[in-house]
Each structure stands twice: as C-alpha cells, then as structure tokens.
UniProtKB/Swiss-Prot annotation:
Pathway in which the depicted protein is active: Purine metabolism; IMP biosynthesis via de novo pathway; 5-amino-1-(5-phospho-D-ribosyl)imidazole from N(2)-formyl-N(1)-(5-phospho-D-ribosyl)glycinamide: step 1/2
Protein name, UniProt field: Phosphoribosylformylglycinamidine synthase
Protein's organism: Pseudomonas fluorescens (strain Pf0-1)
A cellular component annotation (GO) from this entry: cytoplasm
Record family assignment: In the N-terminal section; belongs to the FGAMS family.
Lineage, top ranks: Bacteria, Pseudomonadati, Pseudomonadota, Gammaproteobacteria, Pseudomonadales
Keywords carried by this UniProt record: ATP-binding, Cytoplasm, Glutamine amidotransferase, Ligase, Magnesium, Metal-binding, Nucleotide-binding, Purine biosynthesis
Amino acid sequence: MLILRGAPALSAFRHSKLLEQLSQKVPAVSGLYAEFAHFAEVTGVLTGDEQQVLARLLKYGPSVPVQEPTGRLFLVLPRFGTISPWSSKASDIARNCGLSKIQRLERGIAFYVAGQFSETEAQQIADVLHDRMTQIVLANLEQAAGLFSHAEPKPLTAIDILGGGRAALEKANVELGLALAEDEIDYLVNAFNGLKRNPHDIELMMFAQANSEHCRHKIFNASWDIDGESQEKSLFGMIKNTYQMHSEGVLSAYKDNASVIVGNVAGRFFPDPETRQYGAVQEPVHILMKVETHNHPTAIAPFPGASTGSGGEIRDEGATGRGAKPKAGLTGFTVSNLQIPGFEQPWEVPYGKPERIVNALDIMIEGPLGGAAFNNEFGRPALTGYFRTFEQSITTPHGDEVRGYHKPIMLAGGMGNIREEHVKKGEIVVGSKLVVLGGPAMLIGLGGGAASSMATGTSSADLDFASVQRENPEMERRCQEVIDRCWQLGDKNPISFIHDVGAGGLSNAFPELVNDGDRGGRFELRNIPNDEPGMAPHEIWSNESQERYVLAVGPADFERFKAICERERCPFAVVGEATAEPQLTVTDSHFGNNPVDMPLEVLLGKAPRMHRSVVREAELGDDFDPSNLDIGESIERVLHHPAVASKSFLITIGDRTITGLVARDQMVGPWQVPVADVAVTATSFDVYTGEAMAMGERTPLALLDAPASGRMAIGETITNIAASRINKLSDIKLSANWMSAAGHPGEDARLYDTVKAVGMELCPELGITIPVGKDSMSMATRWNDNGEDKTVTSPMSLIVTGFAPVADIRQTLTPELRMDKGTTDLILIDLGRGQNRMGASILAQVHGKLGKQAPDVDDAEDLKAFFAVIQGLNADGHLLAYHDRSDGGLLTSVMEMAFAGHCGLSLNLDSVAESSAEIAAILFNEELGAVIQVRQDATPDILAQFSAAGLGDCVSVIGQPINNGQINITFNGDTVFEGQRRLLQRQWAETSYQIQRLRDNADCAEQEFDALLEEDNPGLSVKLSYDVNQDIAAPYIKKGIRPQVAVLREQGVNGQVEMAAAFDRAGFNAIDVHMSDILAGRVDLNEFKGLVACGGFSYGDVLGAGEGWAKSALFNSRARDAFQGFFERNDSFTLGVCNGCQMMSNLHELIPGSEFWPHFVRNRSEQFEARVAMVQVQESNSIFLQGMAGSRMPIAIAHGEGHAEFESEEALLEADLSGCVAMRFVDNHGKVTEAYPANPNGSPRGITGLTSRDGRVTIMMPHPERVFRAVQNSWRSEDWNEDAPWMRMFRNARVWVN
C-alpha cells in the first residue's frame, strides 16, 4: 500500500465552521487541521514516470498552503470491506491514464485535533467527523491497509419454524426489523409448513420488504368500517374513480413506475444511433409524471435522505415503459418549527425532539442541499417546490397534543418524456437475460421499506440509521445515458422490461420484474456486482444501494445492449434468466446452496387484506379574532413565516437551466425574485409548445376540516398552474401524495373522508384525473424525554402536483408588475366570495392560534369558470401580471408582485371591506383566488367577462402599482398601513438569509441581503453591439455545407444535448463523441472542424472539477496525441463550457497561447451557484465573440467550482493585459464586479471567460448554449423574436469556418 499526502481538505470558511462545531461539543478542542490522505493498492513497484503521473493525478483543487500537522489524528476512511464511489471513479481515471499497476485508489481525511481530551471526548469528536453508515475513524495512517483486505462472505441463516414454530418467526421479526404484522406471521408459518422446510433469513427479509406498507400500500387497499358503517370503496378505489370518470389524455396509470399523459408533437432532438449525428425526429413527445416522498431517511440523515429521494424518483421516470427520459424536477419540504438561533420567532414554542432524528433547522440546511446536489449532478433542472413549517399544540377531545412535522415530508417529483411505442412494457421471452444496470451492492439502506413503514421511534436507532441509503448521482447519469441510447433505437430498443431498484433492493425489484412479465426467474447471487464481499446472502439481496435498475433483455438483443453499456462505461451484470414457471430461485455458487427457492405466489400472492375499523372525531379548533391585531407587526410576522418568506436559499443551489428546455423557473423578472406560480418546459428546441407543473398543499387546514384541506390543495394547484397557457382544465392531471399518522385517534377517518372528497366528488366535478400518487402512513414521532412520553403527530397531509401540456410557452404569466405599460389596475378575484375564513391561516399560526373555520372550495363551477376566463384573457394578451392568493393571503400576493416589479403599491380596500374590523381578515385570509394586473382602459371589459362567467361578485379593483417604492393601503380615506418596499422585501427575505448565513459563506449571504436595500438597482438589462434578430450564418447555411463539430462528453457530463442543438441551429453537423470513443480509437478528431467540451460533472468531480477528465487526456498517449494534433491545426476551433471550461484549463500545456489561463476552484460562497448573471463581452481574438465586444447581457450560470485562481497576482495582471480575457461579470449598473451575487463565484476582476492568443480556443464558465432561444431565458427583452443574443456566438463560429 502506498500512502500519499494530499492538499488541505477544508477551506478557511469550512475550517472555522467545523472548529466551532467541535469546540461546542468538546470545549477542550483548541485547534484543527485537515488534509486529504490517499492510499493506493498496487500490484508492483511504480516507475519514476508512473510515480510522477500519480502525483499529478492526486494534486487537485484550490492551492491552499500545506501545514505540518500537530494534534491527535482522527483518520476518517470509508468503512473497511467497502469501495467508495470516489475510489471507483479515481481508480477508473488512473487506469485511463495508463497506471495499470494501480488496483485501487482510496481517499480519507486526516483530521489533526489539538487539545487535551478524554477518551469519551475523543469519541464525541469522532462522531462529529464521520458518517457512521459509510465511514470509520482510525488512529494512524498504517491502519488504512485494512481498506484493501478482502473479507470472506457470511453464510446463510435458517429460521427453525418447523421445530420452534411461530415463536421462532416472532423472534426473527424483531431481530431483523421486519415489521411483519400478526396475520403475515401466520401466513408465513403456514406457507413454509406447506413447503415442508424452514425459511432462510434472505426469504423473510425479501417478504418483509415486498409486503411492507411502503411497497404494498396496504392501508390504501384495505376495506373500511367508519363509525360502524361499512364503506363501499377502498382508498385506492376512490382515487381510481377519477380515472374511470375521465381517462382521456392518460396513456398509463397505476401500473408502472410513473404515469404517462399525452404530450405535444415536436422534433425530439437526439443523436442518430447509427451515425451519432444529432437531429430532430418529429413525433408525439408524451409526458411522464411522478412524485415520491422520502420522509423517514430525511429525518435520520437529511443530506443522503433527500439526495436518494430525488435519485429514486428520477429512476422511477427513467424506468417507465421500456425506458424514458427525466426532464425537470420539483422538491418540497414540510418540517416543524425552525427555531433559528438568534432569530427565534414569537410563535415557536420549544418542545424537544428524540436524539435519533435531526432538528428542523438542520433538515432545512442539509436536506435541500442533498436534493439539489443529486439533481445538479444528474443534470435535471429543479423548477418548482414548496416549503412549509408547522408545529403547534392543539386541543382535541382527548386533551392537548402537539401536531407538527418532526417526521418531515421530503417530496421529490418531476416530469419526463417518453416515446409512444415505449409507453407499454414489452414481453419478457423465456430465456431473457435479467440484468442489473448501475452501481454495486453495498451494505446500505438495509430494511428501508419496512423502516419507513413504522412510526419514527418504534425501531432501534441502529436499524433506523442502517435504513438510509447513500448517493452517487454520476452513476445514475451513466445509467440514464444507457437508457437514452436504448429508447433512441425506437423499435430496435433492446429493453423489453425495466424497473428501478428502490425499497427492498433487488429482493423487491427482480421478483416484481419477472412477476409483472408473467414469468419466473432463476438468479445467481454471486453475479450481483458487489463492493462489499463480506455481506451475508440476505444483505446482498435486500440492500438498497442506489443508482440501480433491473431489466429484461431478449437473447438476440443482448450484444447490442452490452456494447452500449461499454461505450457509456456503465457497469451491468447478467444476474439471471427468465423462466416459464412462476418460481423464484436464487443460487449461491460460493456456498453451493439455494438461498431462495419459492413459488412467486408465496412472496407476492394472497397475503391477507387489511381491514380498518375506525371512528370519526370532532375537530375543536380555537377562537381567533384578527380584528384588533396590529397590522404592521402582523405583516412582519407573516413575512417571516417560512411558508410565506422568500425561498431563495432553496432555489439558487439548484441548476434551473440545464437541458436548455426550461421556459419558466422560480426566479421572475429583471430582479430575479423567487415568486413564480408554475414551472414550464419546452417540448423541444423547435416549437413553442411545452409542459407545465405546479403544486398545491394546505396541510394545517386538516386540523379543522380534513376534506377542505384536500379540496384546497387541488384548488391551489389549479390557481398556480393557471399561469401557464393550457387549452382546457381537463388537460391537467394530478399526482396526489398522502401522508397520515395511521392509527392516531380520528386520523384514519380524516384520511378516508378526504380521499372521498377528492376522488369521488371534486375531481370528477372538475373533469380532472389523478393517475399517480404515493402514500406514507406513519407520520408520527415518539420518544421519552426524561421519563415523559412525548409524541409529535403530523396533520393528515395531501400534497398535490398538477401536470399539463402547454399550448404556448411564450404566454406564461408571472407575478412581475409591469411599470412600462401605462396606467394599470390590480384586480382581486376572490373565489371565497367574501367569506374570509381565517382558520389555520398563517396569520393565525404566527399568533399561536388555529381558528375555527377553514377556507374551502365551495363550488367546483367557480373554479372551472375562473380557469376558463384566465386562459381566455391570457390568450388575448390582456394580462400583464398574475399571482395566486395562498399562504399569507392577499397582502402577501400583492407584495410579492411589487417585489418582482421593483415598484410600490397603492391599495384601496373600499370595494372589499365594509368596516375597519374586516381589514385584517381581508388582507390575510387564504381563500382561493388571484390578483391580476391589467391596462386600466381594459378594466371594464375584463370585469364584464368575469360577470358573464358567473364570477361578478368575486372581482374588485383594489389598487394600482406606483413608481415611488412605497406600499400604501387605505380604507375610507384613512391609511391602514404604509411602508417602504425595499424594507418589506428585506423582512420577506430575512428567513432565507438567516439559513443561508448558517449554511454558506456568511460574507456572501450578507452581501446579497444588503443588496436588497439598493433602491436604484436597474435589474437585468441588455446592451448589444449587434442586431439580435440578424442571422449572419444564413448565407453559408443556404449553400448546404454543414461542417462537423464533435460534441465531446465524458462520464458524468450532462449538457451535451443543448450544446449540440445550438451548433445544429448555427449550421453545423453536431456529432456525439464520448471520451471512450477517443481512448478506444473509434473516432478521429481530424474529421472535425470544431470540438466542444460540455458542462456537467465528469467523474462526479472526483480529483477536481474537470481535472480527472483532463488528466485522462494528458496521460493517455492516444488521447494526448489526438487532442494535441487537433489544437495545433490552424483550421480548428474549440469551445469549453463550465465543466468543459474546467477541463480545458487543465489541458493548457497542449493548447498554444493559453499559458495565462487560470485553474477553476470552489466558489467563494462555498456553494453551488445557479443564477442569471450579467456579463460584458471583452475585446479579444475569440472567434466566437467577434463583433460582440462591449455587449452586456444576462447569461445562465450553474457551477460549484467557477472561481478563477491564478498562480499569482502577477499572473492575474499578465492575463488581464494579454487580451485573452473574453468575458467578465458586471453588476446591474454595468460595472465589472467581484461582489456577490453579481459575481457568483468571486473570480478576480470578474473574469469568467478566456481565449487563446489566436482566438481559436475559448473557455467560459457561463452557459450560452442554454439560452440561445429567447424563450429559454428566465427574463427576456421584448425586442427579441426567436433568437436570444447568445445565438450570435455559435453563428460566429459558422462564419469563421468559411
């Protein structure tokens, strides 16, 4: 084993944060130093050259001075017997660099902690420094040799029920954490007595996972008695009723990993499977919809819990039909009170929590980062979501109880696209290869299906922790590339059947796969790729290692499938084959036995149906009279409540422009304020049709009226999605996610009544279907606090997500008030018809109350009329701005509109209030509704249209936007409230700032928060030195000559399709080239005029962002010669964007005239930054930027490591004077800046793009390829037609070639 010291592992900011955390736990800690430690398992002595290559490989990241360590060593390493994702990628890179003697590289962190502390304190320090699920802590470097020792497999265990009867199974139930019900234990005892043998632990574990509440949805399929009366339908039956009543537009419901609905026809853009040339195929582009929850893991370990939640939902989409493509994501969180230190709110009453779960604040710091990190690295934009906190003591017929979300809701959802011929699963022919695609088995997430089906606190802490999985998104990206290559083959798609691997691991996925295909299966346990050879059979079969899919591939298609996997470097293994008889057999060649041998019907067959007998219980509520509240103080409290406050801290960490198909993200207008009602994507690059998704949830209402909370969730989904241009209401399809504390007094009946209200009444009345959903039935947390039993139970919670095809993405409405459209009016549409019910409103909550009467959808006809009128007005161009009314009421709606429009408001309540006692209720009630901005001369006609639709009593003109930055509210000539917009916006942004300050670099958070005080910020703007609507490449395109450009990707790159689309539109033939093609000699770069290295996360940023990719080119002789030859040709051009920019900067020794280029390292904010930034094009030789110098315009940025680090101040100065700086960040006033967030990564002198001296090679961190169409921009100028300013860059390259 070789030991190689690495660079310091912590930035100054992370170092001081960790030191503070350690000294809080152990006050004796006085100092800390941390550096990476690398370990290499080698098969022979390395030569001098090989040692040099290895040393260069392991020098990565920012240049931080190395110290001589002092203090006690805590060496944190991956758990012995496991291979970390870092190791498998770094070892791949080493092999690609020709280091054949390196068996394996592994990395740890050596923490040196100074101070005098006891062994107990040392243990506390170790607990802070490592993740006990995947890591261990050692005391010296030599002990790391254990990383490379190979454990012997553990044997199978039989449970003696033939001898020990039922008692033996009861004991195993507890020891293995199986969560089997009494009737299931009886069922298994009978089944194995019938088979005349004892079950093995692997069979019981498999049965428990496959039949857990999590997988089988027993409550939703149960029969019911309520108050002694038998109910006709199951919960699932009532949901299916929506489909039975209105199935049009639904292509797949209830039977696959996601639902499929009809989409628009467009030119689907992808590479031809034979020629690898990108092009558009005109066909129906159908829409996948899916929303999952990952509540239990997120409570225990928020980052991996939320990350694997997103990963699992992405796999559900990819594994729909015969393979599909995820497109855009959403995330939601509901937690208990945050209690931010130093920012505690008056309504937050501390109640405590159990040790085993994380507090609400830490869930909201770590969980969103996990979800965003997975989506970012996979390459899926996160475009909408919600965030709510709720925790309150309420009065019930049994006394007071605390209701809240100690067990959080973590929602991960999204939409994708699928080809028409792949919607239905294919046939599994006998003899089909049964394949596992993706990562290896590891001992993580064991028993997750069963664990998430229990109330938090009823299983042991170790079992809880063991049930959380760990993530490797770059592996999932590789799997998706394989799936993409397969569906792109059309009728030659080798995948006949596919499922994702989720709860229960392969023990659930493989039986489900063969059973759904009406087959049996014979499997060999030792064929499963395994990074933890010491596992017992049940651990190999049931672990929930992530990023895996199971597939059936026909024998004739297998070689083609294998070639695809090898090109994409995606691991796969043939684990078994399909059999005609429905028997499940798992053999074990190591021990020479059959761990599983049972009929499928024993596993998946007639396990007993659950019956629930429950009673209804009254909701008591409490008295809440808002009429005497101080309006100013109420506004501040409401604006601080997380459900109302800015969600900026959740949004800027998530890439929102990847794919180049995003037409509407959360950030609105020139000031990029996070208030959008709906997310919208384009169907493809050649059309204006698209897809929309929006959410609705009003969970606290369920404590007063559960059915009302369900109806309001659907109502809010409709008022949100109405901002997009949808042809008819019935085009909207819903996902329903149900959360309940089953068994808690009254909750089962509330769940039943709400499902009935939604499934049997409201949805059929609206003509809307719910083709997909999920349930989580154990939403309670129990613990003992110094002898006192405590429980926190969630309200019955329905989260609704709406999806729909969009007729015109250019007509999406936003809340941004327009001050450039003359005199305008604000009109309130109040679907509550003046009832102003205040129950469970944010205003009630921030005063510690619940109220009595919940808002509700009283008449489905009103909602239908509202939707139709809004769509008509939008189609006719009458609506300048639109925002729904929701949490925080009318006041929040209009303030958010003013924040987005950077303007003031003059509101007059005379038309809606009869007395001053009603004012608070009018401003803060959360009845359904919306506010629209219209031109004043059109107001009478618009009011008449509402009247004609039967909504005349619902509409009132309530005021106008004004230019002076003041928000004034009057009634009967008296001022009710006045305040400055910028100060109110700071109140609204403060909760987000407080969390950002704790999570990221506090200096950056403060700069962004203080920037809100700037009254004269002009926002995003455009100043061009050329005509955006002129196509300078048109003459060359007309000649029909299309030069070839190589669109280069490495494993983990995810931005290649939109890059190809931009070059294709500029008149190039874009060709898909994988690094594996170059390393294998399948592709010759001499055939190309251009080469473009795309964005993403090559090798998951292992060995530095873009550095592993670059080094596999530098240190592989074939690749090095290919790249060097290409760069030296005078007729070639090269572009590197984002990850491609980082990669190219590390190839500068091969690129003539690039000696000034910097190295790109971690952003100054220490965070992934996804924003729209202003840049200025500099005077340079870049062939891409000719004729653009001096232009200032917005561009998409999305990166974690974009800070340009030069070797010295002198090198920076030299680069600056060389004429090689091509692009700089500027602020909204047009000045070059280093200030955050205008300069999102803190690069010196705003440098974010450079070129070689002759201009043939250009690198940049921002993403022009995502914003070349006008509709791709989060904010766009009305002067742009089809093209955005960045299209010129690609056309410049086309002109240069000629």
